[in-house]
Amino acid sequence: MLTVIPIPAFQDNYIWLLRQDASDKVVIVDPGDAQPVIEYLEREGLSLAAILVTHHHHDHTGGIDALVKRYSPRVIGPDNSAIPAIDEVVGDEDECRVQGRRFEVFAVPGHTLDHIAFYAPGTPGLLFCGDTLFSGGCGRLFEGTAEQMHRSLARLAALPDDTLVFAGHEYTLANLRFAQAAEPDNPARDAHLGECERARQLERPTLPSTIGRERQINPFLRIDQPGLLNALAEQGSVDDDSAAFATLRGWKDRF
C-alpha cells in the first residue's frame, strides 16, 4: 500500500512524501525546502529514493540541491534548465515507475509552460498536480495562456471521480470563498467550505481532494454552469469557454 504524507513548507506549500508499505525508501514531490524533508526523514529513519518535480518555480525546487547532496536520489521532472540535478526528463504521455507504482505524465501548461502532472492509476488513482489544479481553484497564469490552462484542467477533470488530488498549496479556503462569489448557488461547495474551515481550525490539511469533488465545487471546472456564466457575464466576455475561463481567472486575480 502506498501512503502519502504531507510535509508543510513555507507559509502554505505541501511537499508530498510517498512511502510503499514499510519500505525505508521514499519519494517526495516538489521539495521547495530541504530542511523539513531532512527533519522528517531523519526522525523516521527513512532514505530518499526519488524526487518528482512538476515545474521550475523555486518554491517547488529550492530544496533539490541539498537533498541530492545528502541522499543522491533520482530526480524526475520536466525539461527545464532552471530545475537542478534532473536525472530523467519526462514529458507528455511518458511513464515512470517509483515506489512500485506506475506514473503517467501529463503536460499541463498554463501556470508555467513546463508544468507537468504525475498520475498513478489505481483504485483510487493518485494525482500530483503541483500548481495547476488546487482544491476550489487553479494556478495563476505566469507563463501560459487561459486557453492552455483551460485545456490542462479539462484533461485532469476527465480522470476518474475517485482520483485523489494532491495539490502544491493550502489555498482551499481562499479559493472556496471566491467560488461563493462566482457561483453563489452551490450547496455542495458551501458544505465543503464548512468542512474545510473545521479542518483548518484543527490545523489539518484540506487535501487531498478528489476529482469528483472538484467537479462539484471548483468554478474552474464548471465553466458551463448557468449560474457561473451569469456572474461571469458581469465581469467580462463569455463568448466561448476559453473567453469565460479567461474572465474567471482575471476575476480571481483581482478578488
Swiss-Prot record:
Q: How and how many cofactors are bound, per the record note?
A: Binds 2 Zn(2+) ions per subunit.
UniProt: Zn(2+) 2 binding residues: D59, H60, D131, H169
Pathways involved: Secondary metabolite metabolism; methylglyoxal degradation; (R)-lactate from methylglyoxal: step 2/2
> Where do the annotations place Zn(2+) 1 binding?
H55, H57, H111, D131
GO MF term list: hydroxyacylglutathione hydrolase activity; metal ion binding
Report which reactions are catalysed by this protein. an S-(2-hydroxyacyl)glutathione + H2O = a 2-hydroxy carboxylate + glutathione + H(+)
Instruction: List, alphabetically, the InterPro entries matched.
Output: Clx_II_MBL (IPR035680), Glyoxalase_II_hydrolase (IPR050110), HAGH_C (IPR032282), Hydroxyacylglutathione_Hdrlase (IPR017782), Metallo-B-lactamas (IPR001279), RibonucZ/Hydroxyglut_hydro (IPR036866)
* EC number from the UniProt entry: 3.1.2.6
**Any single biological process term in GO:** methylglyoxal catabolic process to D-lactate via S-lactoyl-glutathione
Required co-factor?
A: Zn(2+)
Gene3D superfamilies assigned: Ribonuclease Z/Hydroxyacylglutathione hydrolase-like
Protein's UniProt keywords contain Magnesium? no
Which key words tag this protein in UniProt?
Answer: Hydrolase, Metal-binding, Zinc
Name the family the entry cites.
Belongs to the metallo-beta-lactamase superfamily. Glyoxalase II family.
Instruction: Give the protein's biological function.
Output: Thiolesterase that catalyzes the hydrolysis of S-D-lactoyl-glutathione to form glutathione and D-lactic acid.
According to the record's subunit comment, the protein's assembly and interactions are: Monomer.
Q: What is this protein called?
A: Hydroxyacylglutathione hydrolase
State the organism of origin.
Chromohalobacter salexigens (strain ATCC BAA-138 / DSM 3043 / CIP 106854 / NCIMB 13768 / 1H11)
